[in-house]
Amino acid sequence: MSYIFTSESVSAGHPDKVCDQISDAVLDAYLTEDPNSRVACETMIKNNMVYIAGEITSTGSPDLEPIVRKTISDIGYDTDDYGFNGETCEFTNLVFEQSPDISQGVTEGEGENLEQGAGDQGLMFGYACTETDSLMPLPIDLSHRLVKKQADVMKEGGLSWLRPDAKSQVSAIYSDDGKTIEGLSAIVLSTQHDEDVTQDDIKEGVMEHIIKPIVPSEWILDSTKIYINPTGKFVIGGPVAVSYTHLRAHET
């Protein structure tokens, strides 16, 4: 018996991903100045406000505010019309030096366990497959590519009414042994948009400029359900719609 497997991806303008990119940018800034930096940076965004907080051990001292503002603007939040703007948002920096008590516990040669070099340990696993050129399963590969295409079309001006926040889901039908993809059960593409565009124009534009260039026609069956902005309206998005927090940590 065949089964359906679904994967989801969010665009660079989705608030969760915005927080991720800000924390990443802070980490990269410290590692550029000091490759041995230990960084725990958490980002929270809501409306036109950005907070970064965390503890850092580093000889570097990058100016974080312009880095954070540029990251937000580069994503596409560069106008007050979106309610979130990298140039005008309220920025609060609550990043401080790491506690010396914690620092000695994660510095090799210090603390009670002289060989311990990290304060947190974890096990991660993953695998590659041959379903796609990216070596990832088809549903997540297509989901990633759809939101990437949405961002590209927005930045290139192909659909002038697109805004940064977007999410996609792709459901693939697999044979009972999991070795053969029989087609797609459903495609969902929700994208933020300007107020003055009709739902018909949104559906046509997304289908022609985003979905068709990415999804091979042979995967779209007569039974495939395609949902484009199924709620009917997605004007309010990003951190104006929801608040998000994301942590980026690095230890050496």
What do these predicted regions represent?
Residues 1-38:
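N-terminal, positively charged regions that mediate nucleic acid binding
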Residues 245-252:
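Conserved small/polar residues in nucleotide/adenosyl-binding loops
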Residues 55-62, 232-244:
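Short glycine/threonine-rich loop-to-helix capping motif typified by GTGT followed
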Residues 39-42, 48-106:
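Glycine-rich, N-terminal phosphate-binding loop and its surrounding beta-alpha-beta segment
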Residues 6, 77, 85-239:
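Glycine-rich, mobile lid/loop segments that gate access to catalytic sites or pores
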Residues 37-44, 168-172:
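Short edge beta-strands and adjacent turn/loop segments
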Residues 1-5, 45-55, 185-187:
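Short glycine-rich, basic-tinged beta-strand/loop micro-motifs
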